[in-house]
Amino acid sequence: MITGATGFLGRNLCEYLSSHGYQLRALVRATSNTAMLEDYEVELVQGDVLDPASVRAAVKGCDYVVHAAAYFRLWGPPEPFQNTNVEGTRNVLTAARAEGVQRFIHISTIIVVGPQKAGVVITEQTPRQPYPSDNYAKSKSEGECLVGSFNDQGLPTIILRLGALYGPYGHYAFNRLFFEEFLHNWRVEVHHGRHIIFPCYVVDAAKAIEAALKRGHVGEIYNISDQSISHRTANSIISRLAGRSNWRINVPRWLMLQFVKILELIAYFSKHEPFYPRNLEPYVFHDWIVDCSKAQKELLFTPSNFHEGARRTLDWYRSIGYNV
């Protein structure tokens, strides 16, 4: 059973697992667009992670649960993050324990550790210290604590901490910043693109989930990411693959932060997420150097290089009408 099946990761996961012979069931909200799942023979159970009865019905009879549902924004009050990412997770864990599932894969994020000092390599042992204003990271950290507690009580759980997802069907965060802004000729680069980002091609994430189902060690956490690269390197690869020049307007940190403050002020009155939310700051102005050797050794996880993932992502943008 998969939660979050109509989301960015979930859609790619259903496509991948269906092509590898898995029988899939998904918990979907009444308002979700499920047309994208029709090709993957997914059994749909209508409900919500906030409704324990519907979660129990979705889990019943399933061997595995992949909990990929999450409320992910870079802006907004804490309540929706807490509701979905903490209480929703509690409901799915409770149902999985009650139904005796064989394995529970919890999808988390590397950002639960918070930004690190320059040169620090992030491993699974890096303490959780989410950025104070990042309600998403804080709620995902709490969700991990819940998973650990249920594991201690006998539910076989594995936590996968994903890097910055990009790839087909994505339009937010990494996809927007590195692909869509560029394809719309918005050529901004902060700090000469020197900081390090931790991309994760979404199909690699799907492969890692299957590997965790087969080979993951119960009770463990695994970092799942491609090789960490600089913003400048990512921009250069995307530009070259798209056949466009790699020029960028360099924006100093102080100017970008002032611009972000203005956008936040406008958002306060408009009630709409700003184009550059404040919580992008830890991603853009810090280095995220991630060690995935544990997943490579225990899950046999082999990430794509960014060149290949970016090429496939640009192919997808071309298929939906972008001028690439």
Predicted regions and their residues:
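NAD(P)H-binding glycine-rich loop region in Rossmannoid oxidoreductase-like domains
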Residues: 31-38, 42-87, 95, 115
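Conserved Rossmann-fold NAD(P)-dependent oxidoreductase catalytic core, especially the SDR/UDP-sugar
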Residues: 87-135, 158
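Glycine-rich Rossmann NAD(P)(H)-binding loop
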Residues: 167, 190-195, 222-229, 239-242, ...
